[in-house]
């Protein structure tokens, strides 16, 4: 495909989107971990345009900062033009063109609520537009059921004679299955001139961009249409139902891309993959798994089932089962889960383990270190090849401030150990079960706490008479006495 040159793009994002019934501006709703407007701008930026303009209007206090953030993400300058009063698509393009006062090349106009459009399709539109020497080129699509869409009518030479809306179409015209998508390529000079001739003499009292086609034809210019290969790319989003439908279509695209890249996805219907996720080869993803943000899954890892990872780096060969994790790193060949909660700032070393019902936060765990089960570990550093016993708690919060715990390498702690931070446990140290560690433990030492166990005989029967426990104790004592008598 030829390189795109002398091109600008205008993305329309000024509408109110009332059918979304939301305090969030329509184009800022997300699918695949990216806003609708973000998807549209990524597609337009794929043209490498000389100028990229977003027309903002309704709730621009929300949209403008979002545009700035997307511009930074794309590393691409994005201008903003304001449509103070939403007076139709033609008026919106007038506002966008005001940001391009000296530009007369090809102007691509697309919409901020069409998230599935690929850059390749826009490049094909540009190529058809310039290759056919059109003044206007409509990006059209062929639908099995075109009801509700404006029909694209063509002359014998293939040029477009008109776009007729459903309500204005004759019975014969309604049989046409090629329809307008609302995406166009314009000759900049022709567009600039035609916009001055638009009028609002219509039922809505608005300026329509589709009227530019008739104005261009009357001026003797050629109007053409390029049929998109996949109509699903041009699915617009106007309400929550369409938002969900577009999300499913995008996710199917992401899942199929992953499988073609060498990933086994056991159940594509219950697997969700965001657009910024990277997955290696020979990865296995089990059902009910969601991967979001900048999550990366290295070769040979296994994720799921019932797992949600957001901004997580998973190393090669690691296993992550029934885990919710955020903003953390899991080393190669590490084992995570089941029922593990990884909060931001966790680094699990190679061959490390966070087991069942473990919650970790802002913690670095060394190579081969295991936290097997029923443990909270937060604000801690643990060295290599240590083992934290079951039901241990890193007591990091004093009610005002968080404090750090440092555990050395080759440490073995007994079950139900409490680490009262700030505290340090040296290399090779041990702790007994039930130990409360309030002071530093030297390397190689055994830490124990609590006095000798004391049993108060008969306490239950004296203090809790008549209870099932007292009755059970009495029976046991009687049985013991009978055994002694018999013997």
Curated annotation (Swiss-Prot):
UniProt organism field: Corynebacterium aurimucosum (strain ATCC 700975 / DSM 44827 / CIP 107346 / CN-1) (Corynebacterium nigricans)
Its EC number(s): 2.7.7.23, 2.3.1.157
Cofactor annotation comment: Binds 1 Mg(2+) ion per subunit.
Binding site for UDP-N-acetyl-alpha-D-glucosamine: 12-15, 26, 83, 88-89, 150, 165, 180, 238, 343, 361, 376, 387
Ranges for region Linker: 241-261
Region (N-acetyltransferase): 262-487
Assembly and oligomerization: Homotrimer.
Alphabetical UniProt keywords: Acyltransferase, Cell shape, Cell wall biogenesis/degradation, Cytoplasm, Magnesium, Metal-binding, Multifunctional enzyme, Nucleotidyltransferase, Peptidoglycan synthesis, Repeat, Transferase
A GO CC term assigned to this protein in UniProt: cytoplasm
Binding site for acetyl-CoA: 390, 396-397, 415, 433
Catalytic site: 373
Function: Catalyzes the last two sequential reactions in the de novo biosynthetic pathway for UDP-N-acetylglucosamine (UDP-GlcNAc). The C-terminal domain catalyzes the transfer of acetyl group from acetyl coenzyme A to glucosamine-1-phosphate (GlcN-1-P) to produce N-acetylglucosamine-1-phosphate (GlcNAc-1-P), which is converted into UDP-GlcNAc by the transfer of uridine 5-monophosphate (from uridine 5-triphosphate), a reaction catalyzed by the N-terminal domain.
GO molecular function, one term: UDP-N-acetylglucosamine diphosphorylase activity
Similarity comment: family membership: In the N-terminal section; belongs to the N-acetylglucosamine-1-phosphate uridyltransferase family.
Pathway entry: Nucleotide-sugar biosynthesis; UDP-N-acetyl-alpha-D-glucosamine biosynthesis; N-acetyl-alpha-D-glucosamine 1-phosphate from alpha-D-glucosamine 6-phosphate (route II): step 2/2; Nucleotide-sugar biosynthesis; UDP-N-acetyl-alpha-D-glucosamine biosynthesis; UDP-N-acetyl-alpha-D-glucosamine from N-acetyl-alpha-D-glucosamine 1-phosphate: step 1/1; Bacterial outer membrane biogenesis; LPS lipid A biosynthesis
Signal peptide annotation: none
Protein name per its UniProtKB record: Bifunctional protein GlmU
């Amino acid at each position: 495909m030829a390189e795109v040159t002398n091109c600008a793009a205008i993305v329309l994002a000024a509408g109110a989107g009332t059918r979304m019934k939301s305090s969030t501006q329509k184009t800022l709703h997300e699918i695949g971990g990216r806003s609708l407007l973000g998807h549209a701008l990524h597609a337009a930026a794929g043209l490498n345009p000389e100028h990229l303009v977003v027309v903002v209007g309704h709730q621009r206090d929300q949209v403008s900062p979002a545009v700035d953030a997307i511009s930074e993400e794309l590393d691409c300058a994005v201008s903003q033009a304001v449509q103070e009063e939403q007076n139709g698509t033609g008026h919106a393009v007038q506002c966008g063109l005001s940001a391009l006062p000296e530009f007369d090349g090809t102007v691509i106009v697309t919409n901020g609520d069409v998230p599935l459009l690929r850059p390749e399709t826009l490049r094909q539109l540009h190529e058809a537009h310039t290759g056919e020497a059109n003044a206007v080129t409509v990006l059209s699509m062929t639908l099995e059921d075109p009801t509700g869409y404006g029909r694209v009518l063509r002359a014998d030479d293939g040029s477009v004679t008109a776009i007729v809306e459903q309500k204005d179409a004759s019975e014969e015209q309604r049989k046409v299955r090629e329809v307008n998508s609302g995406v166009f390529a314009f000759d900049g000079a022709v567009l600039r001139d035609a916009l001055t001739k638009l009028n609002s003499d219509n039922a809505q009292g608005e300026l329509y961009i589709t009227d530019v086609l008739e104005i261009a034809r009357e001026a003797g210019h050629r109007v053409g249409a390029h049929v998109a290969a996949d109509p699903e790319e041009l699915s617009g989003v106007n309400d929550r139902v369409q938002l969900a439908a577009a999300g499913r279509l995008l996710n199917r695209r992401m899942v199929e891309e992953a499988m073609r890249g060498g990933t086994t996805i056991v159940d594509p219907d219950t697997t969700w993959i965001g657009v910024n996720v990277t997955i290696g080869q020979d990865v296995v993803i089990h059902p009910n798994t969601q991967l979001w943000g900048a999550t990366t899954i290295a070769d040979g890892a296994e994720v799921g089932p019932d797992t949600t990872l957001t901004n997580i780096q998973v190393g090669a060969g690691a296993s992550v089962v029934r885990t919710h994790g955020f903003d953390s790193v899991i080393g190669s060949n590490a084992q995570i889960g089941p029922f593990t909660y990884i909060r931001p700032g966790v680094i699990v070393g190679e061959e490390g383990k966070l087991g069942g019902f473990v919650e970790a936060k802002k913690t670095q765990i060394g190579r081969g270190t295991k936290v097997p089960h029923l443990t909270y570990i937060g604000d801690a550093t643990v060295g290599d090849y240590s083992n934290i016993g079951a039901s241990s708690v890193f007591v990091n919060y004093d009610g005002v401030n968080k404090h750090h715990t440092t555990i050395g390498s080759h440490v073995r702690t007994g079950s139900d150990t409490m680490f009262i931070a700030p505290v340090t446990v040296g290399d090779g140290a041990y702790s007994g079960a039930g130990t409360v560690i309030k002071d530093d433990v030297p390397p190689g030492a055994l830490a124990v706490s609590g006095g000798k166990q004391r049993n108060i005989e008969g306490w239950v029967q004296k203090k809790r008479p008549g209870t099932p426990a007292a009755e059970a104790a009495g029976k046991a004592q009687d049985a013991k006495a009978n055994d002694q008598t018999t013997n």
